[in-house]
């Protein structure tokens, strides 16, 4: 049982702290990015250096780049290469792990999950578009039991950034996440039911961890392929990856320049 006394001040203090955090200028940004090809244009743009003695943990494949741009400490975190296959560790599990480790070790003011995605042309997406995500869901966690079905969908809002959206004139839409590049019939049914515009393999997992640890998160997603288009997804993805990651870097740079000197409530 809590002791008697001035309990009111104990209750109010976290609210004051939370308010001061919102009004304090943003000083630390972490980018969570799944693929090296998606990350390197941003790393090169800001002249970031790879950390050799990573605070994220010893003996892990995770890659951390760090540096300073204007008044911001910028960290870019990637899950690195699969030890057996040598390819990027894409998908929800690696994304969840590096998001958790990054928040714990780097204590960012805000997380930006930047990467490529599939888009639906019926929802207005085009190759090369960079979207600011409104909210995220999963499309491959099918649990047909009351309440568990909602848990499976996992709807979460991105941090609201109306001023950023207006300044950069970005498209906005819902992102649906699953662990497959292709889209099964069941996936498609849920994506349509959830009214998603974009499809990726990490976003909702990053959102889950950010929500768990109460860190604001925004999502920048650049369209490499049209899920409802005529070309095979894998072929179109690889064909457009280089050009689209350049577009992603350009938008991410504008986002960083907008964030600099502002607090969370300014976004």
UniProtKB/Swiss-Prot annotation:
How activity is regulated? Inhibited by CBL3 in a calcium-dependent manner. Inhibited by 5'-methylthiotubercidin (MTT) and by formycin A (FMA).
The reaction(s) catalysed by this protein are: S-methyl-5'-thioadenosine + H2O = 5-(methylsulfanyl)-D-ribose + adenine
- How does pH shape activity? Optimum pH is 8.0.
Which Enzyme Commission number(s) are on file for it? 3.2.2.16
Q: Which GO terms describe its biological process?
A: L-methionine salvage from methylthioadenosine; nucleoside metabolic process; phloem or xylem histogenesis
| Lineage top rank: taxon | Eukaryota
Q: Which InterPro entries match?
A: MTAN, Nucleoside_phosphorylase_d, Nucleoside_phosphorylase_sf
Instruction: Supply the alphabetized keyword list.
Output: Amino-acid biosynthesis, Hydrolase, Methionine biosynthesis
Q: What happens when the gene is disrupted?
A: No visible phenotype under normal growth condition. Not able to grow with methylthioadenosine (MTA) as unique source of sulfur.
Positions that bind adenine: 199, 225
> Where is it expressed, tissue-wise?
Expressed in roots, leaves, stems, cauline leaves and flowers.
The protein's GO terms of the molecular function aspect are: methylthioadenosine nucleosidase activity
Its annotated pathway reads: Amino-acid biosynthesis; L-methionine biosynthesis via salvage pathway; S-methyl-5-thio-alpha-D-ribose 1-phosphate from S-methyl-5'-thioadenosine (hydrolase route): step 1/2
Q: Which family does it belong to?
A: Belongs to the PNP/UDP phosphorylase family. MtnN subfamily.
Describe its partners and assembly state. Answer: Homodimer. Interacts with CBL3 in a calcium-dependent manner.
Q: What is this protein called?
A: 5'-methylthioadenosine nucleosidase
